[in-house]
């Protein structure tokens, strides 16, 4: 059956995702940056309170995936911490200046990761040649690739996603579709034979604060509503899981 990974920007969200039936959590912070490395405190709390597999992302900053020496050292230190805390996996990706997989650095990352299941994240979608990148990641023995099919959302990238699935039918990384995967379109990914789906399955919830200071923001973008935040919607996760069960080949023949 197709698995559902839920992208969570807090431990609260991870707990909601687990209760709603998610198969796995990708733990991040920094939603506006597309996901950054969670704090040590968040990692510790997730290990203590979430029982399904949690894969923290290791991404020291927003923007591209070509990192300075300091960035890369920080990434390796973070991966070692995640490994030592006993997480199931880690989500990471590094490119070189020409938009190819940075093989020397990825080999170092694989070595530091030890027994962690490594997901190569959507840095894959920024690669020059996805099929070459796929072969390189297979050589590295990464567990899975999170990808939108090199498009702004995974529905637009279905053609490449199908090619990637076909190329890994017998061996190689699991292809996990992500970016714009929703309850309303997930059947398309199931029908395409994609084994894992990645979704934030979220909604915006209002702040619990009653007093709200006007005219002052903490964000450089003063138009951002800082009295609301994004959170996993447990009902959506439950509905997505139900559809995955009904849409599985086994369910269709019972």
From Swiss-Prot:
Record key words, sorted: Cytoplasm
InterPro entries the UniProt entry points to: CutC-like (IPR005627), CutC-like_dom_sf (IPR036822)
GO cellular component: cytoplasm
A Pfam family per the record: CutC
GO molecular function: copper ion binding
KW DNA damage (keyword) present: no
Subcellular location: Cytoplasm
Chain segments annotated as coiled-coil in the UniProt record: none
Gene3D superfamilies reported in the protein's UniProt record: Copper homeostasis (CutC) domain
Similarity comment text for this entry: Belongs to the CutC family.
Stored PANTHER family: COPPER HOMEOSTASIS PROTEIN CUTC, COPPER HOMEOSTASIS PROTEIN CUTC HOMOLOG
HAMAP family: CutC
Designated name of the protein: PF03932 family protein CutC
């Amino acid at each position: 059956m197709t698995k559902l990974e839920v992208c969570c920007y807090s431990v609260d969200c991870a707990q909601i995702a687990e209760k709603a039936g998610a198969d796995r959590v990708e733990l991040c912070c920094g939603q506006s940056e597309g996901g950054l490395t969670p704090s040590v405190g968040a990692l510790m709390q997730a290990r203590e309170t979430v029982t399904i597999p949690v894969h923290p992302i290791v991404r020291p900053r927003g923007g591209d995936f070509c990192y300075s020496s300091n960035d890369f050292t920080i990434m390796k230190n973070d991966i070692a911490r995640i490994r030592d805390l006993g997480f199931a996996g880690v989500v990471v990706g590094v490119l070189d200046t020409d938009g190819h997989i940075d093989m020397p650095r990825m080999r170092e990352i694989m070595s530091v990761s030890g027994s962690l299941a490594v997901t190569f994240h959507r840095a894959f979608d920024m690669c020059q040649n996805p099929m070459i990148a796929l072969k390189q990641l297979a050589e590295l023995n990464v567990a899975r690739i999170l990808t939108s099919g090199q498009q702004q959302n995974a529905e637009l990238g279905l053609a490449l996603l199908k090619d990637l699935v076909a190329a890994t039918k017998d061996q190689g990384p699991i292809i996990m579709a992500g970016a714009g995967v929703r309850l309303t379109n997930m059947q398309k990914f199931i029908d395409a034979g994609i084994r894992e789906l990645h979704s934030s399955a979220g909604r915006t919830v209002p702040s619990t604060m009653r007093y709200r200071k006007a005219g002052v923001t903490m964000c450089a973008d003063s138009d951002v509503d800082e009295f609301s935040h994004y959170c996993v919607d447990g009902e959506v996760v439950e509905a997505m899981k139900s559809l995955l069960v009904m849409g599985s080949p086994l369910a269709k023949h019972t």
